[in-house]
Structure formats: structure tokens, C-alpha cells
Amino acid sequence: MRVLKFGGTSLANPERFSQAAQLIEKAHLEEQAAGVLSAPAKITNHLVALSEKAALNQPTDTHFNEAIEIFYNIINGLHAENNKFDLAGTKALIDAEFTQIKGLLEEIRQAGKVEDKVKATIDCRGEKLSIAMMKAWFEARGYSVHIVDPVKQLLAQGGYLESSVDIDESTKRVDAKSIGKDKVVLMAGFTAC
């Protein structure tokens, strides 16, 4: 399986996101390929700032709203490019994730600190939403998508914020041969959830 990794700058706006999708599609049509996605540019910085500021009981609205706007900008652009893109469903997913984040921020404020598990849960949301947007992009183009489930398929050792993956065991668990060659394969570049 060929693996293509896309960092945040490659997913920063609708045009770049679409270019990354086209590269994954081209590789998929040539051989079995997987796209590994980071959060769009600036998202991880916003998410990290959210938990840090909440722990200090500082305002988080600016980071929260700017992060949501980055995602909305991307999905609006993808929908403008292809009106089959599930704009309403993807927006609902983004809203649900940010509602969860809002609840976690309130817990952090009340505790006056952020636990590693909660921090990792917030920090990985950007990758999770990149996967959701890319999945919607491919489905709008008629593709089936397989998302590598990190909980079931990747064996990691270490803490929530610093872990390493057991490549040999994870390769067995992912088992590329069992994934239909017709499926576009996507996985998050960082995950804790």
C-alpha cells in the first residue's frame, strides 16, 4: 500500500484540500493507497491554545470561533466545487465535535488544569475532522472509503501525548490485503480518540 502524508499547509483551505484529495485519488487509481491527514493549518495551534487557556480560566472564544471558521471555509469551498459534497452532514459533524470541545473546556475550567487524556482528545479533533471532510469529498465523487480505526488497528505504547506505534503489529492489524482495492483508505496523522 502506498502512503501519502499531508501536513496542515496542504489542507489549509478549500483549494489545497482539493489538491490533496486529487493526489490521493490519482494514487488510488494507480495502486492501493492511503492518505494520512493532519489538521488544516492553524487548527492544532487553536486547539492547543483552547485547553491551555481554559486551564488558566482565560477567554477561549477567539480560538474556538477561528477554528470553526477554518473548517466552515473548507467545506463551503468543497461544496462550491462539487454540489454533491454533503455540506449539511459535514457541518453537523463539525458542530458536534466543537460542542464536545466546549464541554471539555468547561470541565478544564472547573478543574483548573487539563489532564493529558483530555488534552489529547481536544488536540486530535483537527485530524478527525480532516478525515471526515476528505471522506465526504470522496463519497461525493462516488468512492467508497475505508477509515483506519486507530483504536482497533494501531498498537501504540506510551502516554496520551507522547506515544509510538508498533509498526509490525499495526501493519498486521491494518491488513491492507483485506481492504478492498476499490476503497480509498484514510487515516489520521495524530489521534488519541
Predicted feature locations:
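Nucleotide/pyrophosphate-binding catalytic subdomain
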Residues: 1-193
